[in-house]
UniProtKB/Swiss-Prot annotation, chain B:
Each WD repeat, start to end: 8-49, 50-91, 145-184, 189-228, 286-325
HAMAP family: eIF3i
Organism per entry: Neurospora crassa (strain ATCC 24698 / 74-OR23-1A / CBS 708.71 / DSM 1257 / FGSC 987)
Keywords, in A-Z order: Cytoplasm, Initiation factor, Protein biosynthesis, Repeat, WD repeat
Upper taxonomic lineage: Eukaryota, Fungi, Dikarya, Ascomycota, Pezizomycotina
Gene Ontology CC annotations of this record: eukaryotic 43S preinitiation complex; eukaryotic 48S preinitiation complex; eukaryotic translation initiation factor 3 complex, eIF3e; eukaryotic translation initiation factor 3 complex, eIF3m; nuclear periphery
Protein name as it appears in the record: Eukaryotic translation initiation factor 3 subunit I
Quaternary data: Component of the eukaryotic translation initiation factor 3 (eIF-3) complex.
Annotated GO biological process: cytoplasmic translational initiation; formation of cytoplasmic translation initiation complex
Superkingdom, taxonomy of origin: Eukaryota
Functional summary from the UniProt entry: Component of the eukaryotic translation initiation factor 3 (eIF-3) complex, which is involved in protein synthesis of a specialized repertoire of mRNAs and, together with other initiation factors, stimulates binding of mRNA and methionyl-tRNAi to the 40S ribosome. The eIF-3 complex specifically targets and initiates translation of a subset of mRNAs involved in cell proliferation.
Cited InterPro entries: eIF3i (IPR027525), WD40/YVTN_repeat-like_dom_sf (IPR015943), WD40_repeat_CS (IPR019775), WD40_repeat_dom_sf (IPR036322), WD40_rpt (IPR001680)
Pfam families per the UniProt record, alphabetical: EIF3I
Compartments where found: Cytoplasm
Family: Belongs to the eIF-3 subunit I family.
Length: 384, 346
C-alpha cells in the first residue's frame, strides 16, 4: 500500500521586460520542451510529494493525459470542476527576438517567494526567477494535493526510489525534458472490420475480377498493330485502321480495348464501352484508394500557380523547374507538349508551395530571356 | 492515447524489453548504450556503459536484478540493474545477436553470428542471480548451427527446450539439457530470415516474425503452427499482449529500400491482430522509420515500440482498447457473468 497525490496547478505568468512596464503574455505553446504534461512531474513538486507521502512519487499510469488541459494565464479561483486534472505550468519562456534590443544588465534582485494557504485548502506559491534573457519571470501556481491510495507491487515501489545513474545521474526527479517528451494524441480504436474501413485494394472483388479477366489479353492497336490502345496510336490521324490484313486480330483487339476501357472506368459497372469522364474514373475500381491528380492541390494551388507563356519549343520541364526553384519550393511544373511531336506547345504552369514565392517569381521572371524568347509570366486564372 | 517519446538513443533501436513487473523498460540501440526507463512516465533511470559496438540484444532476469546484453563487440555483458555496474564480460569470436534468460533466471543463452570462418552457435551460460557472486567463465553448453545460422532463440517453459529461429526461415527445437536437435521444421518461406521470437507469458507457445511478411504463433512442444498473421510488409518484431488476446507486429520497408519504393508511406506502423481470429484490428502510426522492435507490457496496460528512427514510443492503452471484443467474445463474457450471478444467488 502506498499513497500518491494528484496535483492541481493553476499558473499565471508575467514577464517583466527590463526597463519597460509592458507585460508580455507569451502565446500558449503546446508540445515541445514546454510540454505541459510535465508539470506534475516537475522536480520541486515531486520532491514535495515524496516527502509528504514518503513512499513513491507518482503512480498515475497516464501522467500525460492532462497535457491537453488549457493553459491558464490569469490567477483564477482555485475551485476546480475537474479535481483530478492537472493544469500546466509552462516554466520555460520562449525567447522573443523583439526583446533583444532591450537586453541590458538588470538588477538580480528577486522578490522572495510567497506561499499562501487558501481557504479551500489549496496552496498558492508565487516564485520569481530570471530566465535566459535576464527577464524576471513570475510564476504563480495553485496546488491542491489530493491523496488517493493505490495498491502497488512492493518491488515496483522499491524500484521507484532508486537513484539515477549513468547519463541520467544529474537529472532531477521526474522525466528529463531532453530524453522524454509526449507525442501527439493517437486515436487507436480496435475494430474487427478494420480492413474494410481501410478499403484494401487487393481485397476489392471488382478489381480482382477485372485483373483476372485481363490477365491473358494483350493490347493491340488496330491501326499499326503496336502494343497500345488504338486511341493512343501516333498514326491515328494519318492512317486508317488496317483492313483485311488486321481483320482477324480485330475481334480480340477490340475486346481487349473495351475491357481496358471498362477497367479504367467504373470497373464492373456493366456498361461496356460507355464513356466515363476522367473525374469519375476509378470510382470503386482499382484506383479508388489512389491519389487523384489535382485533388491534392485543389483551391490552394490556384493561388500560387504561375502561367508562363512564350516558352521555347525545345524547353524541358526540368529546365523550368530549375529556373523557378530559385524563388521557393515548386510543387508542380506542367509544360504543355504536343502529343505527337513531343515538342512544347509554348506555355507552362508552375505551382509554388508558397504564394509569396510565386509573387517573387512572377516579378522576376516576367520578361526573362530564355532560349531566345522572352518569357511572359503571370498568375494563372482560375480554371473555368 | 498520447505516446511517450523516449529519445535517449542516437541510432536505430535494436531491442526493447520490459521487466516482469512491467515497470521498467530496457532499450538498446546501435549507438552503444543501454537505457532503462520507468515505463509509466518515461523517466530515464539510467544508462549502462561499457560496450564498444552496436548492441543487438538485451534481456532482464525475472527478479529484475541482473541485465544481460549482447553486442557487436563480440561480448555478452552482465549488469547490475540498480546501479549500472558491469558485473561480467564473456568474449566470443563473433557478434552476439540474441540473449535470453531462462524462466527461472539460472541460465542465459546467447546466439552468436556466423562470420569470419566461425559457424553460428547458441551458447548457454550458468548465471548466479546475485550481484556479488562470481560468475563462471565456462560455457555450460554450445550448440553449433551447421545448416543455417540461428538469428533468434529462446527458452521454453521450465527450460525444457531451446527454440531457435533460423536465417533460412526454419524453426528448430533443441533439448534444453543436452542441446540435442529434436526438430527442425521449415515454418516461414525459404531463405526469409526469422527476425524475432517472443514468448507467451507461460512460455508454452511463441510468436515469430519474419521477413516473408508473416508472423506465426507456434507451440513450443511440437512446433505446431497455431495461427498465421499475414502483413503487407517485411516484419521485424512481433509480441503477444496480456489481458487482451492480441498480437502486435512491427515492421516496414527496410531502411535501405525506403527511397526506392513507391508506397506513399513506408508502412511504419504497429499492427494489431486478434490472436485467435487472426484478423487485423487496427494500426498505430507514429514512427518515421521501420519498427525494429515491439514489446508488450506484461501487465497488459501498455506497449512500446522502437524504430529505426531512434525513438522509443510507449503507448498506454485507452479504455476503448480494453472494451473491444468480438461478438462471440462478448456473448461468452455475458454467459459467464450470468453463471457467476446464479452461483452467487444459489
Amino acid at each position: 500500500m502506498c499513497e500518491t497525490a494528484a496535483l492541481i496547478f493553476r499558473v499565471s505568468k508575467t514577464i517583466f521586460a527590463p526597463h519597460s512596464n509592458i507585460q508580455k503574455f507569451p502565446p500558449p505553446k503546446n508540445g515541445g520542451e514546454n510540454c505541459p504534461g510535465f508539470s506534475n512531474l516537475s522536480p520541486t513538486k515531486n520532491r514535495r510529494q515524496t516527502s509528504a507521502t514518503s513512499t513513491h512519487r507518482d503512480d498515475n499510469p497516464r501522467p500525460f493525459q492532462s497535457s491537453t488541459a488549457p493553459i491558464t494565464r490569469r490567477a483564477e479561483p482555485a475551485e476546480s470542476k475537474q479535481p483530478h486534472t492537472v493544469k500546466m505550468a509552462a516554466v520555460q519562456q520562449k525567447h522573443d527576438w523583439a526583446d533583444d534590443d532591450e537586453l541590458e544588465e538588470t538588477s538580480t534582485e528577486l522578490p522572495p517567494p510567497q506561499k499562501i494557504t487558501n481557504k479551500d485548502g489549496s496552496t498558492t506559491i508565487i516564485e520569481y526567477r530570471l530566465n535566459d534573457n535576464g527577464q524576471k519571470v513570475k510564476t504563480t501556481r495553485r496546488i491542491r494535493y489530493i491523496t488517493h491510495r493505490e495498491v502497488v507491487n512492493p518491488r515496483v515501489a522499491e524500484r521507484k526510489s532508486w537513484t539515477k545513474f549513468g547519463l541520467s545521474v544529474k537529472d532531477g526527479a521526474g522525466p528529463a525534458p531532453d530524453t522524454t517528451s509526449v507525442g501527439e494524441n493517437i486515436i487507436f480504436k480496435p475494430s474487427f472490420n478494420w480492413r474494410q474501413d481501410a478499403k484494401d485494394e487487393s481485397k476489392d472483388p471488382n478489381a480482382q475480377a477485372m485483373k483476372d479477366k485481363l490477365k491473358d489479353k494483350k493490347v493491340k492497336c488496330r491501326i499499326c498493330n503496336g502494343e497500345h490502345f488504338t486511341a493512343r496510336c501516333p498514326y491515328k490521324d494519318t492512317m486508317a485502321p488496317i483492313g483485311e490484313a488486321g481483320a482477324a486480330a480485330d475481334v480480340a483487339a477490340s475486346a481487349a480495348d473495351e475491357a481496358a476501357a471498362a477497367s479504367q472506368g467504373a470497373a464492373g459497372a456493366g456498361k461496356k464501352g460507355s464513356y466515363v469522364p476522367p473525374a469519375l474514373r476509378g470510382a470503386g475500381g482499382a484506383a479508388a484508394a489512389g491519389e487523384r491528380m489535382g485533388g491534392k492541390y485543389g483551391e490552394r494551388d490556384d493561388l500560387a500557380t504561375l502561367r508562363v507563356t512564350n516558352v521555347s519549343e525545345m524547353a524541358e520541364e526540368q529546365e523550368l523547374r530549375d529556373m523557378f526553384e530559385r524563388f521557393g519550393r515548386v510543387t508542380r511544373v506542367f509544360l504543355a507538349k504536343d502529343r505527337d511531336t513531343g515538342l512544347a506547345k509554348g506555355f507552362a504552369f508552375i505551382s509554388f508551395a508558397d504564394r509569396s514565392d510565386a509573387v517573387k517569381a512572377c516579378a522576376k521572371m516576367d520578361g526573362f530571356g530564355f532560349r531566345h524568347l522572352i518569357l511572359r509570366v503571370e498568375f494563372a486564372k482560375k480554371a473555368a | 492515447m498520447r505516446p511517450i517519446l523516449l529519445s535517449g538513443h542516437e541510432r536505430a533501436l535494436t531491442q526493447i524489453k520490459y521487466n516482469r513487473d512491467g515497470d521498467l523498460l530496457f532499450s538498446v540501440s546501435k549507438d552503444q548504450q543501454i537505457c532503462v526507463w520507468f515505463a509509466h512516465n518515461g523517466e530515464r533511470l539510467g544508462t549502462y556503459h561499457g560496450h564498444q559496438g552496436a548492441i543487438w540484444t538485451i534481456d532482464v532476469d525475472p527478479t529484475s536484478t541482473i541485465l544481460a546484453s549482447g553486442s557487436a563487440d563480440n561480448t555478452i555483458r552482465l549488469w547490475e540493474i540498480k546501479t549500472g555496474r558491469l558485473l561480467k564480460t564473456w568474449d566470443f569470436p563473433t557478434a552476439v545477436k540474441r540473449v535470453e534468460f531462462s524462466e527461472d533466471g539460472s541460465k542465459l543463452l546467447g546466439v552468436t553470428e556466423k562470420r569470419m570462418g566461425h559457424l553460428g552457435t547458441i551458447v548457454v551460460l550458468d548465471i548466479k542471480l546475485d550481484v556479488d557472486a562470481e560468475q563462471s567463465d565456462e560455457k555450460a553448453m554450445t550448440i553449433v548451427c551447421e545448416d543455417s545460422k540461428a538469428t533468434v532463440a529462446g527458452w521454453s517453459y521450465l527450460s525444457k527446450y531451446i527454440i531457435a529461429g533460423h536465417e533460412d526461415g526454419s524453426v528448430s527445437q533443441f533439448d534444453g539439457k543436452n542441446g540435442d536437435l529434436l526438430y527442425n521444421i521449415p515454418i516461414h518461406e525459404l531463405n526469409q530470415p526469422i527476425t524475432d521470437l517472443q514468448w507467451s507469458h507461460d512460455r508454452t507457445y511463441f510468436i515469430t516474425a519474419s521477413k516473408d511478411k508473416t508472423s506465426k504463433l507456434i507451440t513450443a512442444k511440437d512446433l505446431e503452427v497455431l495461427k498465421t498473421y499475414p502483413a503487407d510488409t517485411p516484419l521485424n518484431s512481433a509480441t503477444i499482449t496480456r489481458k487482451k488476446d492480441f498480437v502486435i507486429l512491427g515492421g516496414g520497408q527496410a531502411a535501405m529500400d525506403v527511397t526506392t519504393t513507391s508506397a506513399r508511406q513506408g508502412k511504419f506502423e504497429a499492427r494489431f491482430y486478434h490472436k485467435i481470429f487472426e484478423s487485423e484490428i487496427g494500426r498505430v502510426r507514429g514512427h518515421f522509420g521501420p519498427l525494429n522492435t515491439v514489446a508488450a507490457d506484461p501487465t497488459g496496460k501498455s506497449y512500446a515500440s522502437g524504430g529505426e528512427d531512434g525513438y522509443v514510443r510507449i503507448h498506454h492503452f485507452d479504455k476503448g482498447y480494453f472494451d473491444f471484443m468480438y461478438e462471440v467474445e462478448r456473448e461468452r463474457q455475458n454467459k459467464l457473468n450470468q453463471q457467476q450471478q446464479q452461483t452467487i444467488s444459489a
